[in-house]
Amino acid sequence: XXSVPAFGHYLPAXP
């Protein structure tokens, strides 16, 4: 769920 902002883009993090 949700995503985490990383290096100017978003990575999947969990559901």
Curated annotation (Swiss-Prot):
Signal peptide: none
Gene Ontology annotations of biological process type: defense response to bacterium
Tree of life domain: Eukaryota
UniProt KW Ligase keyword: no
Entry's Gene Ontology cellular component terms: extracellular region
Keywords for the protein's UniProt record, in alphabetical order: Antibiotic, Antimicrobial, Secreted
Compartments, record wording: Secreted
Main location: secreted
Protein role: Antibacterial peptide.
Descriptive protein name: Salmocidin-1
Organism listed in the record: Oncorhynchus mykiss (Rainbow trout)
